[in-house]
Every structure is written in structure tokens, then in C-alpha cells.
UniProtKB/Swiss-Prot annotation:
Organism from which the protein derives: Chlorobium limicola (strain DSM 245 / NBRC 103803 / 6330)
Group of enzyme by EC: ligase
A biological process term (GO) from this entry: phenylalanyl-tRNA aminoacylation
Residue ranges the record marks as coiled coil: none
Protein name as catalogued: Phenylalanine--tRNA ligase alpha subunit
Subunit structure: Tetramer of two alpha and two beta subunits.
Gene designation: pheS
Amino acid sequence: MEEAIRSLQQEISDFGIQSNKDLEAFRLKYTVRKGLIADLFGQLKTVAPDERPRIGQLLNTLKKNADEKQTAAEAVFSAQAARKAPALDLTLPGRRHYTGSEHPVQKVLGDMKQIFHAMGFSIATGPELELDRYNFDLLNFPPDHPARDMQDTFFITRGNPSGDVLLRTHTSPVQVRVMLDNPPPIRVICPGKVYRNEAISSRSYCVFHQLEGLYIDKNVSFADLKATIFSFARQMFGKDVKLRFRPSFFPFTEPSAEVDVTCYLCGGKGCRVCKKSGWLEIMGCGMVHPNVMRDCGIDPEVWSGYAFGMGVDRTVLLRYKIDDIRLLFENDIRMLRQFPA
């Protein structure tokens, strides 16, 4: 056993390691778990008990010498590889790292909030899963109104004792909750997601973002409403923006109007986006209906108010001249990178 150890020690000393290939051959022959050194350690149990300490010490020395030779060779070859590697040119430009940015919908929504906040409006929010009572009943919707049909509204459950549960079709329920919980005067905006059972196209989507506003005080008039909308539009779209008010109907306002702006794509000449009209609707508005105020515990003989609501996504299309609303929901990185932080 001792002679085999000395012979292997001489063999290891004479082994020339001139390349990585030689180094790998050395490792496989001597230092791996099934190499020659490990075989000798396995034979240690056949040695007489009184000789085992001395033989074991010789084996440990053998293994140490082999490991040191292997480590020294690895260090040499590693240093040689480092010297051969191309030098780092510190004058080269760094690699570009793409940073995240605010989604255009959130950017526009933030700007809208800031504009109305400067006018004295506070922000109110509410649940997206809403009761029929808040979404329709308290907003003066008659029982047979088309909006209550399955074709227009996503109902979650129907026939519950507490009322039908649905995905809200507008953020008006938030206004109802504010009126029920707070005495006038009230001045709030209500941003959030809303859901409607609509066909998806370049102009409409089944989920979109909406911002509604409510102002209730004494002697509030339609002139106050127009002044608020004109001020908002000039700050949002520029001081030269053209607006058009059209008479309309909403169950929760009387009188009611819709507000249009000049089409952003054709400049009012007529195109497929504006359906050849030259105008695009941006919001609906009107004076809060007396029935709504009574149902919410506010006396319409003492108080008056206006309400308005607009699609945030459509405002994004107007500001950035995007011709397809679906682009806002696809999370296409090529489109989103056009709106850097």
C-alpha cells in the first residue's frame, strides 16, 4: 500500500499540464470521486489497524499535493485567458436601458384630475361591482329603460332580495353615494373603470375609463356648467379648441346636453373616425334632475347642481391622435414606448 502511494505520488509529480485538455485529463485520472486517489482511500480498510494512521497521513498528503497542482494549473490558464480577452473600451456608449413609463390613459386621467382639483373639486371613488339601486334606480332610470337589459349591462346576479348585482355602467353611482352621505354643498369628480356590453371596435370597448363630475350648491345654473366645461377643454386640448353643445337626454339630468370637439384627425373636414361629421363627442352633461336630488335626500327647491361625464379613453385618442381605442388595452410595448416618462 505504501509503495502504491509513493508510485502514484511520483506519477502525479511527473504529469505535465500544458493545456486545458491536459488539466481535464489530470482531474479525471486523479482527483475526481472515482479517480486513482479515491481508489487508494477505498483500500485503506484493508490495512492493518496499527498502520492505518500512518498510511492515512500519506494518502492525505498525496491528495493535498494533487489538489494543489490542479489549482495552480487552473490559476495559470485563467490568467492566460484573461490576458487574451479583448480590452474593455471605456469610451464606448453604454447599453440603453428602457425604463417604464406612465400609461397614456393614466397620464391623461392624472391631468384631468389636476385640472378639476384646481377648480375646487375633490375626488370620490366607489365599487366597480354595484347594486342596481345605485346604478339605475336612484338615477331616475325607469324600469323599462334599455340600459337595464342584458344586451347593454353585465349583470352578475339577478333576483337577489337586496337587488341585482352588476358591473357599473358609469361612475354615477359614486355621485349617488356622495349625495346620500354628505350634505350640500358638494363638488366632486368620480374617476374609474366602467363596463358595458358593447361590440369591440375602433371606437368602443367593453371596458373603459370614465370621469364624472358633480357640483351642488345654491343658485347653480347651466351657465356655471358651460363655464366649467369650457375652462376644462381649453386646459386639456388647447386654448383654440372649438366646442359644440347639443341638446340631449339623460334620465338623471334636465336639461341635458352633449359636448363635441372638432375631430382631431380631419380637423373638422369629415373622416371615418368622426363619421364624416367633423365633430367628436367628449362628454354628456346637464343639470341634476330634481327626482335624483329628492331620492338622495336633497331638497331641489333649495339646492341646484350640474353633472357631467366623459370617457377618459376617448380623451386620450383626441390628445394623442390615436385612431383605434383597442390600442389602449393591448399593452403593445411598441405603442407604449411612444409615451416616455
